[in-house]
From Swiss-Prot:
Pfam family of the protein (one): SecA_SW
Gene it is expressed from: secA2
CDD domains per record: DEXDc_SecA, SF2_C_secA
Key word Hydrolase present: no
Phylogenetic placement of the source organism: Bacteria, Bacillati, Actinomycetota, Actinomycetes, Mycobacteriales
Name of the molecule in the record: Protein translocase subunit SecA 2
GO biological process: intracellular protein transmembrane transport; protein import; protein targeting; protein transport by the Sec complex
Alphabetized UniProt keyword annotations: ATP-binding, Cell membrane, Cytoplasm, Membrane, Nucleotide-binding, Protein transport, Translocase, Translocation, Transport
EC number in record: 7.4.2.8
Listed GO CC annotations: cell envelope Sec protein transport complex; cytosol; plasma membrane
Knockout-associated phenotype: Not essential, the disruption mutant is super-sensitive to azide, export of some proteins is decreased and has a small colony growth phenotype on rich agar medium. It cannot replace secA1.
Length: 784
């Protein structure tokens, strides 16, 4: 249940910190003493001119950050440089946050407390110690904004800074990665890693070896999007799903031909439904060996598209295209697709021409991408609530940073209603009442459909509201920045504009401005939530929009017994239904309503953690297999292993080619062998990924034969991978033996080794309906 006010945290036991995955108080106390010690050097730093300040920074000994004697001097120099270059003088709590990130923690800092500056100081500390730092953001807009904003500070400390966005060329990316500090979105860093797995010459590599990852909005990247696969795809001639099957499935009746579970996460054919589909398809047997992995899979995918995926909730249709909605950010995800057939099935369902799926050349989850870095740290407004996941999956601790000014936001108890309709009516009435006073209101909705419905009702009620749910990041930031203006009413999905402060009175209003004072007198920003999320952390992110840097503010959440989090996790028969008959608004008056909401949310959080853990075990298998492929590929790319192996396997062919190629035969043969070996390794990995995707789509059917789907998936995946190495080397030897000599470079005809004519990158949507429960065990040393 939300507290009525937020205050500065008191002393908590070391055991409590550990339970939350937080650093112990002893470490916090040491960092605090170092921050206080920086005051002894502030006058010396202030007396230095700009050139001397840069030299002083470069002379610091920060290689061993844990025991660095110069850390207090670094803090003083960084504070002085920040004030000179950005006009912002870091508070003690910002320096404390930087120190805890330098210790390898994720810090929790309230909205408006200056995470961007604290992160830049931490990045500078790592870079001055000789580390290469990637500051990882949730989108391109923030990557470029923060690099340009914090760039002068980093340059004043003698460091180089770069940024990468989707528009950056390969040369621009290489240049940015060569900088001491590089700002980039998690997507772009991941896509660069994937694209590097296609190069056949070391000179074409873009992404450097990972060193330090400093993650902004760490809970969003490390938890909400941890299991989202980033994908590199290439042109192929794979068959598209049959439109007639998708049309037939659309004619089936709920409850008669198919059933869904209580949470609407899964759908399956009934016996009657199976008979209908078999008849429509010419009397086939869906469960025969011929159709169980093909036709039945297509039907199941079409069922998911028709029944479980809802327009304006999971996706929108715009400009004759299906655009997915990112569940954790509540906004359009332009780079995301559903895997293979599901994307095409939704497009066919909406009467849109199906887009080319291509074949997956390589893939990596966000979690596996981040785990490549030897050092990971980060910052967010809601880290403690994600402490268990951060500890379990990344071995990260959490450091809560006290606010510079105590938080005086007032969080009202939930208002609970019997029906969703009654709840929406109450929300509109409440917003209209608050709007009459001029107090700005920010409304957080769960999806696009809800935000548009609420916006329409507000307009009918005479409330001029702005709806924000599907614009680009820069436009989102501009609109959100004005949500604190006098009389503003902004309806927004959960994550829209995250990373942008909401200043009372508007973005261009100073602290002493009359309009800011007027808004503060009215109570500051008022946040309205249209229902509990599946995790309290997301609720707190929304609440945290109000009460910035000691400003007044308030929040209230409206819920109903029909909300997803309640309907999926509480028995309706046990819910209190008492309402005030005089009010007639459907509001529940039972005192235990709020505690029931808390319980439903805790159950939801537990299930999400279980899904994350189970899916993580499945993804670990692919990550381990991919690591073996990457290691093998690096060896082939950077050494003469390919030439030596083919020379050993085909000595006569090698000798003949060496004679034909003349003086520079060894150099040319090294290139020829490398191209052949890399091609067949990449081809084998691509086909292996396609095999894994195929067995995943039908692995649950193993349960019909009383087999454990998880064990079966593991067995099949490991068996297939074990033969990948031998098959790739054998295919390479065959190509080497049969390739004809030519006069042109490289000396033999390799035209049959054609790579995709075009490639593209995308994210596989973090499907809220998925419930993967795969496992991973040890892998054989297939290339050893």
């Amino acid at each position: 249940m939300p507290k009525t006010s937020s205050a500065k945290p008191g002393r908590l036991s070391s055991k409590f910190w550990k339970l939350l995955g937080a650093s112990t108080e002893r470490n916090q106390a040491r960092s605090l003493s170092e921050v206080k010690g920086a005051a002894d050097f502030e006058k010396k730093a202030a007396d230095l001119d700009d050139e001397q300040l840069t030299k002083a920074a470069k002379l610091l000994k920060l290689e061993d950050l844990a025991g660095a004697s110069d850390i207090t001097q670094f803090l003083a120099i960084a504070r002085e440089a920040a004030e000179r270059t950005t006009g912002l003088r870091p508070f003690d709590v910002q320096l404390l946050a930087a120190l805890r990130m330098l210790a390898g923690d994720v810090v929790e800092m309230a909205t408006g407390e200056g995470k961007t500056l604290a992160g830049a100081i931490a990045a500078a500390g790592y870079a001055l110690g000789g580390r290469r730092v990637h500051v990882i953001t949730i989108n391109d807009y923030l990557a470029r904004r923060d690099a340009e904003w914090m760039g002068p500070l980093l340059k004043a400390l003698g460091l180089t800074v770069g940024w990468i966005t989707a528009d950056s060329t390969a040369d621009e990316r290489r240049e940015a990665y060569q900088c001491d500090v590089t700002y980039a979105s998690v997507n772009e860093i991941g896509f660069d890693v994937l694209r590097d797995q296609l190069v056949t010459d070391v000179a074409d590599l873009v992404s450097p070896n990972p060193d330090v990852a400093l993650i902004d909005e760490a809970d969003s990247v490390l938890v909400d999007e941890a299991l989202v696969p980033l994908v590199l795809a290439g042109t192929s001639h794979r068959e598209q799903p049959r439109v007639e099957i998708i049309r037939m499935v659309g004619e089936l009746e709920a409850g008669k031909h198919y059933d869904t579970d209580a949470e609407s996460r899964n759908v399956h054919l009934t016996e009657a439904g199976a008979r209908v589909m078999e008849a429509k398809l010419g009397g086939i047997d869906l469960y025969s060996e011929e159709h169980v992995g093909t036709t039945l899979t297509e039907i199941n995918v079409a069922l998911h598209a028709h029944v479980l995926l809802q327009r304006d909730v999971h996706y929108i249709v715009r400009d004759d295209a299906v655009h997915l909605i990112n569940a954790s950010r509540g906004r359009i995800a332009s780079l995301q697709r559903w895997p293979d057939g599901l994307q095409a099935a939704v497009e066919a369902k909406e009467g849109i021409e199906t887009t080319e799926t291509g074949e997956v050349l390589d893939t990596i989850t966000v979690q596996a991408l981040i785990n490549r870095y030897p050092r990971v740290c980060g910052m967010t407004g809601t880290a403690l609530a994600a402490g268990e996941q951060l500890r379990q999956f990344y071995k990260l601790g959490v450091s809560p940073i006290p606010p510079n000014t105590p938080n005086i936001r007032k969080d009202e108890p939930d208002r609970v209603y019997i029906t969703a309709a009654a709840k929406i009516d109450a929300i509109v009435e409440h917003i209209a009442e608050v709007h009459k006073t001029g107090q700005p209101v920010l409304v957080g909705t769960h999806d696009v459909a809800e935000s548009e419905e609420l916006h329409e009702k507000l307009l009918k009620a005479g409330v001029p509201a702005v709806v924000l749910n599907a614009k680009n990041d820069a436009e989102e930031a501009a609109v959100i920045a004005e949500a604190g203006k006098l009389g503003a009413v902004t309806v927004s999905t959960q994550m829209a504009g995250r990373g942008t402060d909401i200043r009372l009175g508007g973005s261009d209003v100073g602290d002493d401005d009359a309009e800011k004072k007027k808004v503060a007198e009215l109570g500051g920003l008022h946040v309205v939530g249209t229902g509990r999320h599946h995790t309290e952390r997301l609720d707190n992110q929304l609440r945290g929009r109000a009460g910035r840097q000691g400003d007044p503010g308030s929040s209230v959440f409206f819920s109903s017994w029909e909300d997803d989090v309640v309907a999926a996790h509480l028995e309706r028969s046990k819910l209190p239904m008492e309402t005030d008959p005089d009010a007639g608004d459907g509001r529940i008056i039972a005192p235990r309503a709020a505690s029931l909401l808390d319980h439903a949310q805790r159950v939801a959080e537990g299930r999400l953690l279980d899904v994350h853990a189970n899916t993580w075990r499945y993804n670990q298998l692919i990550a381990q297999q991919r690591a073996i492929i990457v290691e093998r590929r690096e060896t082939l790319l950077r050494t003469d292993t390919a030439r030596e192996e083919l020379k050993e396997r085909s000595p006569e062919r090698y000798a003949k080619l060496a004679e034909e190629l003349g003086e520079d035969a060894e150099e040319r043969l090294e290139k020829i062998c490398r191209l052949i070996m890399l091609y067949h390794l990449d081809r084998g990995w691509c086909e292996h990924l396609a095999f894994l995707a195929d067995i995943r789509e039908s692995i649950h059917l193993r349960a019909l034969g009383r087999q454990n789907p998880l064990d079966e998936f593991h067995r099949m995946a490991v068996d297939a991978f074990a033969s990948l190495a031998a098959d790739a080397i054998e295919a390479a030897q065959q190509t080497f033996e049969t390739a004809e000599s030519v006069a042109d470079e490289p000396g033999v005809d390799l035209s049959k080794l054609a790579r995709p004519t075009s490639t593209w990158t995308y994210m596989v949507h973090d499907n809220p309906l998925a419930d993967d429960t795969m496992s991973a065990l040890s892998l054989p040393g297939v290339f050893r």
